[in-house]
Amino acid sequence: MNDLVDTTEMYLRTIYDLEEEGVTPLRARIAERLEQSGPTVSQTVSRMERDGLLRVAGNRHLELTTKGRAMAIAVMRKHRLAERLLVDVIGLPWEEVHAEACRWEHVMSEDVERRLIKVLNNPTTSPFGNPIPGLLDLGAGPDASAANAKLVRLTELPSGSPVAVVVRQLTEHVQDDIDLITRLKDTGVVPNARVTVETSPAGNVIIIIPGHENVTLPHEMAHAVKVEKV
């Protein structure tokens, strides 16, 4: 696959990531996430707009078109199926999984996806708890995207007192920080783990697990962790 297609798919998935996290997709956010210059991002966004993959709204918000969203969903589906394979079958260390899946997402065919779904026993979420979108497009399912109604972001929890929660999702942005995802794994902050959280006066979120050192997340990262209240 050529670099142009890779770049397009990376941009589409990044916009999809931002939407999942509840962050407004702007060119500045893409520049931060992909570590690219402002002019490079603007040029790529303009090309993608000409190609009918997105539109730039009046408030500079990037909106995926129907065509662009379908492509973004397909890329994310491949990414999260790859993550499942890398963890469940290959046994790759958690902190290496996201970066490796970022490579696989650009080269996996739909035929391989369908075979993976069977081999992996019809998964609906990634190892990090995130829903695998677009399964129905492959004739598989159920689609897990609607299973998030009870979930809240760590930043949405009330401050002032400890709150017991179950960790459900660590988004792509969290996984992209190797030091952080390693620390979360080592302290047991993984999907389905029960933890206690507190919000500090500075707005950071402190995760408390008995027998482990507390983990403090800055607001940006806490926003990217979804939990369910106990």
Curated annotation (Swiss-Prot):
Subunit structure: Homodimer.
Keyword Cytoplasm: yes
Function comment: Metal-dependent DNA-binding protein that controls transcription of many genes involved in iron metabolism.
Name of the gene: ideR
Similarity remark: Belongs to the DtxR/MntR family.
PROSITE patterns linked: HTH_DTXR (PS50944)
GO biological process: negative regulation of DNA-templated transcription
Cellular localisation: Cytoplasm
GO-annotated molecular function: DNA binding; DNA-binding transcription factor activity; protein dimerization activity; transition metal ion binding
SMART domains, per database record: FeoA, HTH_DTXR
Organism: Mycobacterium leprae (strain TN)
Protein name listed in UniProt: Iron-dependent repressor IdeR
Pfam families with a match to the protein in the record: DtxR, Fe_dep_repr_C, Fe_dep_repress
Keywords: Cytoplasm, DNA-binding, Iron, Repressor, Transcription, Transcription regulation
Highest classification ranks of the organism: Bacteria, Bacillati, Actinomycetota, Actinomycetes, Mycobacteriales
Signal sequence region: none
Record carries keyword Oxidoreductase: no
All residue ranges annotated as the HTH dtxR-type domain in the record: 4-65
Chief location of this protein within or outside the cell: cytoplasm
A single GO cellular-component term on record: cytoplasm
